[in-house]
Regions:
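C-terminal anchoring/interaction modules
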Residues: 1-172
Length: 172
C-alpha cells in the first residue's frame, strides 16, 4: 500500500498535517453494471460491494459477455469474470448472515466474553467455561464457513452453466 508507506515515512519525519501533502485515497464507490461494463472494456478495475443486487450484476455481466466485442477482449472478459466471482462471494456471505443470524449474535457475545481471557492463555486453559466458549466459537465458525463454501460451490456451478450457454451460442 503506497499511501500507507508514504504516510509512515512522513510521520517518521515528524511532518504535521500530512493530509495536506498526501490526501487520503478516494474510496471506490459501488456502480451499476453498465458503468462496470465501460470500465471492463477500458481495462480499468472495478469491484463488487456488499448490498448490491448481486444476481442482477451477474446476469448483466453474463449478457454483456455474449457480445463479440467483449469476447474478443480478454482483459474485459477477465475483469467481468473476476467481478462475477466477487458477487458470488458476497452473495454467499450475505446469505450466510441471514441463515446464521442467531449464531452470529451468539458468536459476537462469546468473542466479547472471551476477549479479556485471550490475553492470558494460562487463564483460558484453567477455566473450563472459557474452553467451552472457545469450542463453541470454533463450532459456529466452522458451520458458517462450511455453509458459505456450499453456497459458493452451487453459485459457481450456476455461473459456469450460464457461461457455457453463452459460449455455445456464440460458437454455434
Amino acid at each position: 500500500n503506497m499511501y500507507q508507506a508514504y504516510r509512515s515515512m512522513y510521520e517518521a519525519f515528524g511532518i504535521k498535517n500530512i493530509n495536506a501533502i498526501l490526501p487520503p485515497p478516494q474510496q471506490p464507490i459501488p456502480m451499476d453494471p453498465s458503468l462496470e461494463h465501460i470500465l471492463a472494456i477500458s481495462g480499468k478495475p472495478f469491484q463488487a460491494y456488499p448490498g448490491q443486487d448481486h444476481k442482477a450484476h451477474i446476469d448483466a455481466h453474463l449478457s454483456f459477455m455474449s457480445i463479440s466485442m467483449v469476447q474478443n477482449n480478454p482483459m474485459a472478459m477477465m475483469g467481468l469474470q473476476k467481478n462475477i466471482l466477487e458477487h458470488i462471494s458476497l452473495m454467499a456471505q450475505e446469505q450466510v448472515q441471514i441463515e446464521f443470524m442467531e449464531e452470529m449474535k451468539e458468536l459476537q457475545m462469546l468473542q466479547q466474553q472471551l476477549a479479556p481471557m485471550m490475553q492470558n492463555p494460562m487463564m483460558m486453559q484453567q477455566n473450563p467455561m472459557a474452553m467451552q466458549g472457545q469450542q463453541r466459537v470454533q463450532q459456529i465458525t466452522t458451520a458458517i464457513e462450511a455453509r458459505k463454501a456450499v453456497l459458493i460451490a452451487e453459485m459457481t456451478m450456476d455461473y459456469a452453466k450460464e457461461e457455457d450457454k453463452i459460449s455455445s451460442e456464440v460458437g454455434g
